[in-house]
């Protein structure tokens, strides 16, 4: 089974006085395929999902993805979870259960050979 790199972080519900309505964010640059799987599955689970929100996966500072995934043609995605959803044990359990359910199917749904040059991403 080919590896898939998932960079998982959390974000604040409010930044500089502005509410951030997304419950989950899917960050991507070169790998739109993996991002679309995550956006679809998280939306299907009832979450309001941001496409490259609350941050952009196209930012040059995404060291983990740039250096460990894109450089090796490994399928990848950045996931941001709004902190108020995981502030308590029940919320952590719910998010973990949702992610676990569909992550088990990822290797069969994402082919590593589809990464570069076939979706408008970076080319070697």
Q: Model-found features: residue ranges?
A:
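Catalytic cores of processing enzymes, dominated by hydrolases/peptidases
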Residues: 3-88
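His/Asp/Glu-rich mid-to-C-terminal helical/loop segments that flank catalytic regions of hydrolases
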Residues: 87-120
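Terminal accessory/targeting
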Residues: 123-124
